[in-house]
Amino acid sequence: MSKIDVSIVIPTKNAGPLLDRVLQAVFEQKTEYVYEVICVDSGSKDETLDIIRKYPCRLFQIPPEEFGHGKTRNYGAAQGTGTFIVFITQDALPAADTWLQNFID
């Protein structure tokens, strides 16, 4: 397995269909970096988990009462194996397909 350069952490809860577009854009990044996507879900009741499972994400589920903006991000970062950690929200569409490359450079 290749060394992971970047861990992208996305906290989720009831993200809805926009998450599908976000994940598609993340996985279409043009970059020299090897990256993983970590989704930390805190009790979604909609289609969020099904959407995440369509992609090669690492999914971690936590109880809703364990959610905290910083705490959840820290948990996701701790699961990552990348040299760099990047956080995005469940509704943040990357601005371009070179977003990750530009961000890390």
Question: Model features per residue range: what roles?
Answer:
Residues 34-43, 62:
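Short beta-strand/loop segment that forms part of the nucleotide-sugar
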Residues 62, 88-90:
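Catalytic metal- and UDP-sugar-binding loop of GT-A-like glycosyltransferases, i.e.
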Residues 17-20, 46-53:
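Acidic helix N-cap motif at the loop->helix transition within catalytic regions
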Residues 62-80:
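Glycine-rich, basic loop-to-helix element that forms the pyrophosphate-binding segment
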Residues 1-27:
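N-proximal low-complexity "stem/linker" segments adjacent to membrane-targeting elements
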Residues 41-49, 93:
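A conserved acidic beta->alpha catalytic loop
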Residues 85:
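Short aromatic/hydrophobic "clamp" motif used to bind/position activated sugar donors
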Residues 93, 98-105:
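Conserved donor NDP-sugar-binding/catalytic core segment of glycosyltransferases
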